[in-house]
Amino acid sequence: DYYASRGLGDVYKRQRWGWAIHKYPHYEEVGIEDVTFVGHATDDFQHHRNWAHDGAYKPIKMTRLTNSWMRRVNFISVSEANSITSSANVSAYDIKIDGNRGHAAIRSQGSSRVFIGKVTDRTNGPLIDNRGVIQQGAGQYHACGVSKPSMGAVIWRVHWGLDACFESHATQPRATLIDNCTGGFMQYRQGGDYNQMPNHLADLTLWNFNAKNNVADSPFIWWDNNSLWWKFLPPIVVGYHGGSIHFDESQMKLNEEQGNTVTPYSLYEAQLRKRLGAVPALSLIHI
C-alpha cells in the first residue's frame, strides 16, 4: 500500500473516511447547586400537541461543558429539566422534579461519560393512553436517559414516574447503564424520529430495574419489524423485577434473573469499588 509503506496510513484513513481533528470550545468546572427552577407547564400535558406542551419551559441547559456538575436542584412544572449537550464528564444528581408533568427529565445528549443519579420525578398529569385519568406521580413523558450519540452514560438510582420509561432518543446513543432504577416501564416512550433510528446501539444494560407496572404487551419486543420506529440493538437485562413482563429473548443479548434482584445490587457502585477501593459517600444516601 502506497500510504502504509510511507507511514501515512493514518493520513489515508482520514482522507478516506473524512476524519478530522477540530478544536472543542468549552467551559470547565461549572457547578449549579442549591436552586429551584419553577415553570408553568400546563396541567393537561399531551406529547407533541404543540410547542407549548413540548418545550415552553426549559429553564436551563448545560452545553459544551467538561468536569462540571448539577446537584441539589429542584424543578417544578417544567417542560424539560436539563439536557447535558456536547459535554463530557458531567454529573447531575440529588435532583427532584415535581409539579405538572412535562416532556422530558434529564438526558445525556451527544455527550460522553455523563452521570445522572438520584433523580426523583413525581410530576402529576394525565395518563398518556387515557387522558381522562390524572395520575399522581405520572412522571415526565421521557424519564432520565440518553439522546443523540451519547456514549458511556450512567443512569443511577433514579426514581421516575409510573407512566414513563427511560429515554433513548435515537441518533445512535450507545453504551448506557441504567442501574438500580425504579419506575414505570411503558413501551414507546423512548423517542426519536424514524429517520434517526435505531433508538440505541450496542451495550444498553439494565441492572436491577424495579418496575412499578405490569407490561401487557406480550411479548415485549426491542426491534419492531412492522414499524419504522422502536429499534434497539439487543440489550443486556439483569435482575428486572417488580411488575410482570414477558420479553422476547430472541431480541436480547441476555435476560438473567428476571423476577429477582442480583448482587451486586448496583453494578456502577461495584465497578467504583473495584477501581477506587471504596464507594463515595453519595451512594450511601438512598432515595
Kindly label every feature range from the protein language model.
Residues S5, H22, E33, V38-H40, ...:
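A structural detector for beta-sheet-dominated domains
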Residues R16-W19, G55, S77-V78, L162-D163, ...:
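Short alpha-helical segments and helix-capping/turn motifs at coil-helix boundaries
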Residues K13-V30, R49-L65, I84:
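Extracellular beta-strand-rich solenoid/capping regions of secreted or surface-exposed proteins
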Residues Y2-Y12, I285-H286:
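Single conserved hydrophobic/aromatic residue that forms the stacking wall/gate
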Residues E28-G39, T66-S77, A88-R101, G110-Y141, ...:
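Right-handed parallel beta-helix
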Residues W156-D163, R174-L284:
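Catalytic domains of carbohydrate-active enzymes that cleave complex glycans
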